[in-house]
Amino acid sequence: RELHGFIHMFEDTPEFVARHIIREARSYLDGLAPPFFKALIDYAQDGSYSWHCPGHSGGVAFLKSPVGQMFHQFFGENMLRADVCNAVEELGQLLDHTGPVAASERNAARIFNADHCFFVTNGTSTSNKMVWHHTVAPGDVVVVDRNCHKSILHSIIMTGAVPVFLKPTRNHYGIIGPIPQSEFEIEAIQAKIRANPLLKGVDAAAVKPRILTLTQSTYDGVLYNTE
């Protein structure tokens, strides 16, 4: 619990006490929403015209036809006024991490207990490719879960990496389980490197895989103890 002030019931007037309570309530509400959401609420309620994408201009374009008005009534003006692009200066920028966007990224990093957090609007697939393009160079050996998402396969192709696959288990129901611990042994990985036709003539003992990618969790909900 935190103490922010006192109310002197027998000294202050009811009007003053009411203003005091309203001030504290407003302070609570102002700090309740995370940074970007608060900026989005403020922008949508500001009454500014929309001269940027999307082309419905804050929902106005939908009001020009009967079916458009049905659409507008179904979703509501509030949502359509808040449907904006990254050209709105008041909301900050995803590309250079400024303004409320940057504040929200810092807030998310704090919540996740991470050093940094960057928002991506193209989903996990694009996030995976970004990590790989930053980390992996053509010809690098990478160790990858054979039950990986297709974005990892795309990353292998795009970066020119040489994959060494770890084979997961599968039960009699066809459900793919975790990768056996034996697959992670150095000797097992070196054996896979020696057997890889794309690495013919390479000294397996000298190879240092550039990245390890696991599917966490699997599509059937299997979780690894990554510690």
Task: For every predicted segment, state its role.
Residues 4-7, 115, 140, 210:
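Conserved acidic residues
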Residues 1-81:
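N-terminal glycine-rich, Lys/His-bearing helix-loop that initiates the first secondary-structure elements
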Residues 116-144, 150-155:
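Conserved beta-loop-alpha segment that forms the PLP phosphate-binding cup at the N-terminus of a helix
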Residues 98-101, 122-127, 148-151, 217-222:
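Gly/Ser/Thr-rich loops at beta-strand to alpha-helix junctions
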Residues 174-227:
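Active-site phosphate-binding strand-loop segment of PLP-dependent enzymes
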Residues 68, 73-126:
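Conserved N-terminal alpha-helix of the aminotransferase class I/II PLP-enzyme fold
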Residues 144-163, 168-170:
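Substrate-binding/gating loop at the entrance of the active-site cleft, primarily
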